[in-house]
């Protein structure tokens, strides 16, 4: 009988449950007043001190009981709030894991995505209905065990894959921890002894209302108000107790949102063409910019049937080689590196890439060299013979520094002692005095640059001089620029040179995929600007009308021509 009654109570909406509690106490109050009021008039007739004693005891008791009610409401609210936070953490970790699968090679990428979608379906369709019946199912554990086996069987082959894999495992553990908190809440409730205290205390309060000697109408009004207050407070406690079962319960909404925003399109578009966009280091600019571009492209998947997957890579040189080898369909590349590959110059003299094609231009990238405060290095000529980090082999910065060093005409003994550290390791090495300077080719403002400047009060090095002027004059893909000091709390701008970040592909790339990139980014440019500070000043003219390092892909050219953007 008790189980049926609780099941009926749990089936009520919050409004219905509130009405039941308030109505119960209100009716009890009225019945008691109707029965007791005539007798109390005879008892206290001519004995005012009896009524005074009742009021005094009721006031003190009521204060203590009100404190108990308040504490119980706060406690149950905190339990519900904590559970909401755990569910949000589970959803956030799930979303990050799903996006991070882009960094994994096929077929592991598709297998992980399918397993994560299956887990999400199970949580929404199986776990939560079971929670409402105070049951915990084992299916979620089985699915997580399968995902764990997939993750631990993977061996990263690049530094970017290693970093993403480490983050993937961290978020996987965070999701498991949040899930365990959710499961423990299935059986979380207020102890029965406290419920007995609440109900007995409420009934004693009602009895005190019956014993007051007032005129009938004021006593009914006062008793009704007090009864409704008791009903509301106990309703709140009851509704938030068992936070996965009752009226004010925690639902799977955050996880449902992850499915709708991140996964649903893949269930509804199983035949969508998936293309990979090579980006850069996770701590750099290319990776978040690549995620932003893919997010824009994937919004129109129902229209063009193309899914974009952003992959972390060492950078420009790696992206070009991967496009050539067919491992990537698209890549974000420095225009100077792309130009050298297309023309067969510099590092590409023995391996030209005449099939390389441009898709769209992005933002200017400036050569940014940082040194510790107090360093004697002020200009690029001062770097001769110094220890300089120029980024990982395969990055655009590495290739750009080779071009600059050649233009400077240094002898062998004057050339820099280069290192190939990633952004975080380079920052630590600079602050520790293990290197003299750190070079980046990056769009501004940059979080990596900001972190380095604040880590050990670093300064910028000017990239200027006759040799640099001659280099810019001979290279159409380079231009003079300056790093705005105001972006980093500095008083002066620093002269430098720059290039552009460009999305590149191969001449043989699927025209539908190229057109999807071009159409989506142009149509959503206002949204794209909000995705990363480096994209904030992006214009259609710069994206389509600039000097490309290689000819436009025919599909991109056709899109821009149809939009009237090509002159």
Language-model regions, residue ranges each:
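Alpha-helical transmembrane anchor segments
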Residues: 7-41, 184-268
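A structural signal for short loop-to-beta-strand junctions that line the ligand-binding cleft
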Residues: 350-362, 367, 486-494
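Segments of small-molecule ligand-sensing domains
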Residues: 488, 493-567
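Bilobed "Venus flytrap"/periplasmic-binding protein-like clamshell domains
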Residues: 272-300, 306, 365-432, 526, ...
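Pocket-lining segment of extracytoplasmic ligand-binding domains
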Residues: 335-337, 345-347, 375, 412-512
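Transmembrane signal-anchor/signal-peptide helices with a preference for the extracytoplasmic
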Residues: 67-88, 241
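N-terminal (or domain-start) structured segment
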Residues: 270-334, 340, 349
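Structured inter-helical modules in multipass membrane proteins
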Residues: 96-187
């Amino acid at each position: 009988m008790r189980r049926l009654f609780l099941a009926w109570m749990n089936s009520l909406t919050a409004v219905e449950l509130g009405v039941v509690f308030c109505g119960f106490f209100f009716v009890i109050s009225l019945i008691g007043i109707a029965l007791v009021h005539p007798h109390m008039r005879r008892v206290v007739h001519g004995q005012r001190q009896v009524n005074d004693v009742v009021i005094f005891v009721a006031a003190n008791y009521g204060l203590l009981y009100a404190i108990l009610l308040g504490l119980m409401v706060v406690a149950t609210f905190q339990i519900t709030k904590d559970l909401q936070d755990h569910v949000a953490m589970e959803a956030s970790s799930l979303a990050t894991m799903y996006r991070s699968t882009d960094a994994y090679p096929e077929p592991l990428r598709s297998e992980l995505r399918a397993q994560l979608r299956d887990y999400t379906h199970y949580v929404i369709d199986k776990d939560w209905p079971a929670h409402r019946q105070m049951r915990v199912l084992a299916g979620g554990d089985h699915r997580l065990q399968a995902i764990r086996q997939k993750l631990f069987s993977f061996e990263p082959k690049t530094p970017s894959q290693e970093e993403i894999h480490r983050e993937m495992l961290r978020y996987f553990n965070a999701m498991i921890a949040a899930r365990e908190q959710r499961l423990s809440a299935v059986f979380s409730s207020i102890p029965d002894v406290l419920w007995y205290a609440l109900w007995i205390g409420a009934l004693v309060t009602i009895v005190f209302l019956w014993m007051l000697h007032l005129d009938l109408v004021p006593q009914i009004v006062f008793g009704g108000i007090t009864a409704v207050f008791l009903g509301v407070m106990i309703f709140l406690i009851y509704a938030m107790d068992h936070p996965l079962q009752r009226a004010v319960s925690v639902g799977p909404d955050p996880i449902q949102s992850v499915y709708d925003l991140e996964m649903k399109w893949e269930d509804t578009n199983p035949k969508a063409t998936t293309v990979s966009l090579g980006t850069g280091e996770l701590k750099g600019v290319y990776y978040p910019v690549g995620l932003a571009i893919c997010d824009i492209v994937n919004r129109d998947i129902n229209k063009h049937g193309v899914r974009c997957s952003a992959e972390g890579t060492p950078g420009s040189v790696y992206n070009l080689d991967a496009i050539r080898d067919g491992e990537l369909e698209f890549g974000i590349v420095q225009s100077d590196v792309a130009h050298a590959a297309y023309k067969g110059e510099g590092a590409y003299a023995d391996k030209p890439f005449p099939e390389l094609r441009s898709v769209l231009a992005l933002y200017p990238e400036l050569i940014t060299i940082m040194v510790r405060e107090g360093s004697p290095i002020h200009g690029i000529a001062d770097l001769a013979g110094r220890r300089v980090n120029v980024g990982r082999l395969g990055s655009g910065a590495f290739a750009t520094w080779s071009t600059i060093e050649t233009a400077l005409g240094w002898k062998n003994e004057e050339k820099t002692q280069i290192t190939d550290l990633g952004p975080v390791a380079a920052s630590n090495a600079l602050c520790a005095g293990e290197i003299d300077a750190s070079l980046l080719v990056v769009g501004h403002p940059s979080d990596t640059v900001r972190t380095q400047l604040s880590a050990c009060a670093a300064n910028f090095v000017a990239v200027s001089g006759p040799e640099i002027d001659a280099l810019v004059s001979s290279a159409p893909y380079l231009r003079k620029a300056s790093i705005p000091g105001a972006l980093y709390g500095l008083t002066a701008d620093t002269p430098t040179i720059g290039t552009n970040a460009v999305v590149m592909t191969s001449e043989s790339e699927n025209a539908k995929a190229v057109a999807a990139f071009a159409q989506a980014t142009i149509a959503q440019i206002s949204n794209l600007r909000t995705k990363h500070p480096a994209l904030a000043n992006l214009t259609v003219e710069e994206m389509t009308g600039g000097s490309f390092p290689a000819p436009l892909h025919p599909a991109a050219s056709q899109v821009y021509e149809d939009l009237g953007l090509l002159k």
